[in-house]
């Protein structure tokens, strides 16, 4: 029976989101109100990343998720559909860590200052900061007990281990200083 199910899984047409999360499942709608869809224009090509709302006016993502024009979508469950809970906000300024190295991906962390504050709703809420590589996953948060611990940085293109994360707590002084100064 299992081989038949596996065979059928390969024969079925893939959905748009298929294959991005290995071994995962669809989340309950709006159960992760801090999750952000980041769209980036790079050389006339739209790219996508994930991120986390860490304040009403800031999103935390990976520094390699940079481009000439960036916008974020908050409050989405299905990014393929326009939902009444969605808020699309342009990014005023992208602030990569000053020591980000694109060659070795060290310090791969960036703050996105939003052009306007996100309206907090049941579908949109900031994630707590710790106080005291499938395409599209870059910049997404690694969360433990509702506190952001890491940002997806890079991994193998065949989606097998290892993957690398930027440790958020190592960058708290920079994050706090940057958000306070703007």
Which stretches of residues belong to each language-model region?
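Extracellular "complement/coagulation-type" protease architecture
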Residues: 1-182
């Amino acid at each position: 029976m299992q081989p038949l199910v596996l065979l059928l899984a390969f024969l079925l047409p893939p959905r748009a989101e298929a294959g991005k999360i290995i071994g995962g499942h669809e989340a309950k709608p709006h159960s992760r109100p801090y999750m952000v869809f980041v769209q980036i224009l790079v050389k006339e090509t739209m790219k996508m990343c994930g991120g986390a709302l860490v304040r009403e006016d800031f999103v935390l993502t990976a520094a390699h998720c940079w481009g000439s024009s960036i916008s974020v979508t908050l409050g989405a469950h299905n990014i393929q559909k326009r939902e009444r809970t969605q808020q699309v906000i342009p990014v005023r300024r992208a602030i990569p860590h000053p020591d980000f190295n694109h060659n070795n991906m060290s310090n791969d962390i960036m703050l996105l200052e939003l052009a306007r504050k996100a309206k907090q709703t049941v579908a949109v809420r900031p994630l707590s900061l710790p106080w005291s590589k499938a395409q599209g996953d870059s910049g997404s948060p690694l969360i433990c007990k509702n506190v952001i611990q890491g940002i997806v940085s890079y991994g193998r293109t065949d989606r097998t281990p290892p993957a690398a994360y930027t440790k958020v707590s190592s960058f708290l002084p920079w994050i706090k200083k940057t958000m306070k100064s703007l």
